[in-house]
Amino acid sequence: MAARRGFQRLRDENRGAWEEIWKGRIKLVGADPPWQALSDAAYYYLHASAHSSSVFSTSMFGLAYWPNYHYYRGHVMWDIESFAFPALLLTAPEAAHALLAYRSQRVVAAQRNAAMYGYRGLQFPWASGPRDGEEVIRLSAPHLVFEQHVSLSVALAFASYVHATGDEDYLRETAWQVLEGVANWITSRVVKTERGYEIKEAIGVAEQTEPVNNNAYVNMAAARVLHEAAGFARRLQRRGAECWDEIASHLYLPIDRSLGFVQNHDRYTPDQKGSAAATPEALAGFFPINYRVDPALERSTIEFYLQRADQFVGSPMLSALLGVYAAWNGDRAGALRWFERGYADFVEDPYAEANEFSRKRFPDKPRVGPFMANLGGFLISCLYGLTGLELSAAEPAAWFKRPIILPEGWEAIEVDRLYVRGKAWRLIARQGEQRATLQQH
């Protein structure tokens, strides 16, 4: 087909396609030029690596291949649904749909995986292989057995797709089987105790060497999945809603009452040291999971983990979100500083590709990019975290939940075109305003 069309026609069609894609560019008004360059590069690498015609989702490095690096060769992991998918959802929904199709076409493997561990429903593997969706990492390591939160990211991605598109047919025919399956998996995974419902022996984002009880990120994400599944069950007049809401509302969250912060897990203490202890897992439950707690508890939890983030920043994924947490607490200078250390320091010139680890903090790590989780994390920080955008079944005008506090020097975040429920909208989030707004084209 390409030979028949000829090079010039293909080139013209490619330019036309990119002209449309760039209408979803995230504009950082007032920011120093390097920030816009970083945002544009991240946007390009993400959209260049995901397309509506893809049948294998995208891997941790998108289309890049690094022969000197032995990880993630075609593996599809939680990073995609958590960090890459949300930015695509509103700017290129067809590409986002393709990422979900990869999961929906491999639910049999997730069902077998859950059964193998003695659970019901769907448990997606930690590192999914494109051929049939089975686990592809052949190691006897704790995180393969206990790091199960990938299923929560997958389910929330399907819920977000339905909220953003309003596609009722997709909900009934595709999304529901995943949401119901993961909700049933959570139901069989929790243990009822005098404290409510608990998830024991889990490994979260920090990837400790040993599993912990009641990992804050895992429990918050599980509660969000159950509430989403319950809402859709009522919408479709299916069973399960009351049970799922009951578990979600009483899923135990470890809180240090004396210091007033959400603990990363049951055994977590403030005197623990090292990168794993400093990983802000509890904050990841606030964003991008959107688990709500009392505002005072949220603020003090953010303060607690940002005070320890020096030991963590430079590691993958959550580093790119640190600026959001500082902004939520009203620290504009801190937000800029954390984005610098949590994202800009990962980026390699001259092509502005984000590495897996910070080049400044870990100069001996191999140069490998563009790493989808980090660049996606920065994009969703700008598109969702700083604008207060939380997708839900409500009308789009009600999606914005927070006052606009941007990094120091940034005046606004604007996107000329986002796709919301089949229509094109313009996003405007101006520093100091009470809420961001969507304007229909």
Please describe what each predicted stretch is.
Residues 72, 83-84, 134-135, 208-236, ...:
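C-terminal capping/lid segments that line or modulate ligand- or cofactor-binding pockets
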Residues 1-71, 441:
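Acidic/polar, glycine-enriched structural segments that form the non-catalytic walls/loops
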Residues 268-275, 304-313, 343-348:
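Solenoid-like repeat scaffolds
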Residues 73-78, 86-90, 208-302:
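Extended ligand-binding clefts on enzyme/binding-domain cores
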Residues 41-48, 79-96, 106, 152-168, ...:
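Alpha-helical support elements that line or immediately flank enzyme active sites
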Residues 50-68, 94-156, 162, 169-173, ...:
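Helix-terminus loop motifs that line ligand-binding clefts
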Residues 1, 65-76, 122-177, 181-246, ...:
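The feature captures the catalytic groove of carbohydrate-active enzymes
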Residues 28-36, 50-56, 89-100, 151, ...:
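Structural helix-adjacent loops and short alpha-helical linkers that scaffold large soluble proteins
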